[in-house]
Design a protein with these regions (language model features):
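N-terminal entry module detector
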Residues: 1-38, 258
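Conserved acetyl-CoA-binding loop-helix of GNAT-fold acetyltransferases
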Residues: 48-57, 190-195, 199-216, 233-238
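Conserved beta-strand in the GNAT
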Residues: 18, 22, 27-36, 161, ...
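Short amphipathic alpha-helix that is part of the acyltransferase structural core
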Residues: 1, 108-142
Length: 258
């Protein structure tokens, strides 16, 4: 959430619309949530009573909510409350979608795969745009891909590409670094390798290289990965990443019309 907030501050027109909520216990913030249209609502860790109240607040003004993402118990509390708000949006049903693993790393074991890392530039922009769209389509989150300013959006991303034997073979991005009570954190993502270049270790090589860049700054690296993709999770484990949490995706289904 923090990296998205930084992006919105820097580029207010990056999303169609955006909302942030915080849950407080007195003067203490005990939870937060955000939504950047047209994407899902992200729920952070928070008391279950707070997530139930949030559901009521969201239902009042957001009948186009496509789904939610967050810790399982927080999502469950939100969904139970949302189903009883009586709003148009709440009459949609929800179904469990993808489960993501939250992974962090303390000690990097660099990949031995040959190649070089290069930052996004005019010379590789076309490839980065193509691969960004392909990645979004694969994770079923391609709502931005047809935006008129999509190329400009890609230009603003902190992307790196892996080149082997003169050919671009994989890509990884870095989100904005966020300051937390536990220190600075930078998220790795997206990570994408075209199908024809997979199973050669290029994804692990580029992920390891950008992780090293993060660690050189003194920040801690983290990433989200699809729990249903054993190949990528094996790669991350080999690099030294460890699973510390999970988040669930719940998709909303519009009611049938007569």
């Amino acid at each position: 959430m923090g990296s998205v907030a930084i992006n919105v501050i820097a580029t207010p027109k990056l999303y169609d619309a955006y909302w942030w909520w915080v849950a407080r216990n007195g003067e203490t913030v005990v939870g937060a949530a955000m939504r950047t249209a047209p994407h899902y609502l992200w729920l952070g860790p928070m008391p279950l009573a707070a997530s139930a109240e949030l559901a009521t607040a969201v239902a009042v003004h957001d009948d186009e909510l496509p789904g939610i993402v967050g810790p399982d118990t927080v999502c469950g509390s939100f969904l139970r409350s949302y189903a009883h708000t009586g709003s148009v949006g709440s009459r949609r049903t929800s179904q469990l979608g993808r489960e993501d693993l939250v992974q962090t790393i303390d000690e990097l074991r660099p990949s031995s795969v040959e190649g070089t890392l290069e930052p996004l530039s005019d010379s590789n922009l076309e490839t980065a745009v193509e691969w960004s769209k392909a990645f979004s389509a694969e994770v079923e989150n391609d709502a931005d891909s047809n935006a008129p300013d999509y190329v400009e959006r890609v230009k603003r991303r902190n992307l790196f590409l892996w080149r082997y034997n003169g050919q671009l073979v994989s890509m990884a991005g870095l989100a904005s670094t966020v300051r937390t009570p536990a220190g600075f954190i930078t998220r790795v993502g997206p990570v994408y390798t075209p199908p024809k270049f997979r199973r050669h270790g290029y994804g692990g090589a580029v992920t390891g290289a950008v992780t090293a860049l993060i660690m050189e700054t003194g920040a801690r690296a983290m990433l989200f990965s699809d729990a249903g993709n054993p190949t990528s999770n094996h790669v991350y484990r080999d690099l030294g990443y460890l699973i510390v949490d999970t988040v669930q995706h719940f998709d909303f289904i519009a009611p049938a019309t007569i």
